[in-house]
Design a protein with these regions (language model features):
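Compositionally biased terminal segments of proteins
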Residues: 2-214
């Protein structure tokens, strides 16, 4: 079972995940570079029927790859649910290129922040049949803070400066607003401050850094 890297009482520890994990690709599944992500999404779009354009909102490693914070990822996560025709198109592209069956999935939809606003998203692909939006980085930050796996911590460090938070306290306030069902974490500001301090020396995550288990 995957373990979650969490911060409490001034230090990091490994605990059980706070939510169910998407089945992970095997080590033989090809990594998705930004160019591959765009190409495969266009192929998906071209397989969709005319007259009913669809939309996904990408988050996580795929969005960070598209924005230049990573060189690659294992899958494309959407916080907007995929319809049947979209899932069928995803499966066809997977068969065509030997990808994981759920290389594009909506498993993250259940963990969308309550602060998420689709109108604030960036447009990453504007195809007549498929619009691909990118979630605002501040929303991605709180989602990754919620997941808190090892690679999420690395991603948080990489994107901190680009998120535009005025302070660790502001980021913590957004986190608690995004997930109001969680108990108040008195150590969260210190955790975020540590991420921000490491963020000044952040670099793009290279291909060899991507762990297929994360």
């Amino acid at each position: 079972m995957l373990l979650q890297l969490s911060y409490s009482n001034g230090g990091w520890s490994l605990t059980s995940p706070v939510y169910g994990e998407t089945p992970k690709p095997s080590v033989s599944d090809p990594l998705l570079t930004p160019d591959r992500i765009r190409a495969y999404l266009i192929e998906v779009a071209e397989l969709l029927p005319d007259g009913s354009p669809q939309c996904i909102v990408v988050v996580g490693g795929s969005l960070l790859a598209l924005l230049g914070f990573r060189e690659a990822t294992n899958d494309v996560d959407s916080i907007k649910r995929l319809g049947t025709s979209l899932k069928d198109a995803v499966a066809q592209v997977a068969d065509r290129h030997g990808l994981a069956p759920r290389w594009l999935n909506d498993s993250a939809a259940g963990f969308a922040p309550q602060t998420f606003d689709e109108s604030a998203c960036s447009v990453e692909l504007d195809h007549p049949r498929l619009r691909v939006l990118g979630a605002p980085l501040q929303q991605v930050f709180v989602m990754k803070l919620f997941a808190a796996r090892a690679l999420d911590i690395t991603d948080l460090t990489a994107i901190w400066s680009a998120c535009g938070f005025e302070s660790p306290e502001q980021a913590a306030d957004l986190y608690h607003a995004a997930y109001p069902h969680l108990e108040w974490d008195e150590y969260l500001v210190d955790e975020i401050r540590a991420i921000g301090e490491r963020g000044s020396g952040a670099r793009t995550i290279r291909l060899g850094d991507v762990d297929p288990e994360l």
